Amino acid sequence: MRLNKYKDPLPLLVHSPNCRRYRSWQLLLGLLLLWPELCGGVNMQQFIQSLDMMRNGCMVKFKVPIEILNRIRDGDFDMEPNQDLLCYTKCVAQLAGVLTKKGEFSVSKAFAQVPIILPPELQTPAKNALTHCKEAQNAHKDTCAKVFYISKCMADFDRAHFKFP
């Protein structure tokens, strides 16, 4: 493919095999713009919008029925999870920036993200739930299961303040 130096190369990029990579960067940029560090966090409306964006980004990768996603959004993790549901929760954690390079859930990264991605009214309850549930992942070897069960623990600890994409 030869580029004419006077034409905009962006349309060629969008229709090229690298399009998925380009769209992934667009999604990442969009998520970063929703979490303004300099503004001191987000309000509840922005937080709910970011949950929707994370859900949309992860639900296309895993076959989890929308009914199940709606249940876990409000903290109902009382189900026998399949591998898709386990890895959906890991995908969300990855988008939230709380995984290590090895794909493990990091409690310290989660604490660091709390003031950035949560509205003020959810920050203290989230920190309390993280403190209570930090050991919940230790009983599991699979990284997807670790994230699912720490999320379940946090939901069970304080369902009134728990929200999940």
Where do the PLM segments sit?
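Mature extracellular/luminal domains of secreted and GPI-anchored eukaryotic proteins, especially small
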Residues: 30-165
